[in-house]
């Protein structure tokens, strides 16, 4: 019996939904690409279209970091974060791409980030980890590193398709 699933090539997309976040993808040939989040919803939609290209929606594995407002968030920051999150949800839905979400601690723990690092140190650690995982990828920044690692987590663990 032939395993047809193994012959299907998927495109993996990971999104860090913050305004200072990013979007990354591993294409059907295994090449990683990463982009900072555009400033406008129109540019977000255009970038999403470029990323998915002509890949059928059923062959796209999309994972976005699940976010929520916390008591320590300023109202304006929480609203901005939620706005971006909702825009990505709408963009994916308009392309009939199923949106999956994961809480930050799931992918951060999986990638091996030490516990109890302060935010700035953790962000630098994650950026360095993304560079270690994808040394040929140019311009890995604080804006793209989380999306890169979310995409890696999506492919290798969440969808379990190494």
Describe each region flagged by the PLM.
Residues 1-162:
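Phosphate- and other anionic-substrate recognition elements at nucleic-acid/protein interfaces
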């Amino acid at each position: 019996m032939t395993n047809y699933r193994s012959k299907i090539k998927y495109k993996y997309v990971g999104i860090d939904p913050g305004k200072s976040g990013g979007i990354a993808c591993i294409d059907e040939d295994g090449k990683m690409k990463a982009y900072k989040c555009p400033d406008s919803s129109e540019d977000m939609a255009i970038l999403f279209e470029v990323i998915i290209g002509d890949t059928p929606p059923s062959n796209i594995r999309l994972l976005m970091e699940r976010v929520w407002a916390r008591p320590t968030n300023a109202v304006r920051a929480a609203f901005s974060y939620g706005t971006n999150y909702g825009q990505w949800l709408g963009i994916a839905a308009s392309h009939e791409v199923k949106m999956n979400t994961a809480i930050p601690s799931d992918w951060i723990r999986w990638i091996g980030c030490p516990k109890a690092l302060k935010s700035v140190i953790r962000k630098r650690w994650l950026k360095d980890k993304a560079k270690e995982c994808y040394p040929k990828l140019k311009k890995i920044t604080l804006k793209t590193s989380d999306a890169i690692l979310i995409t890696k987590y999506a492919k290798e663990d969440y969808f379990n398709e190494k």
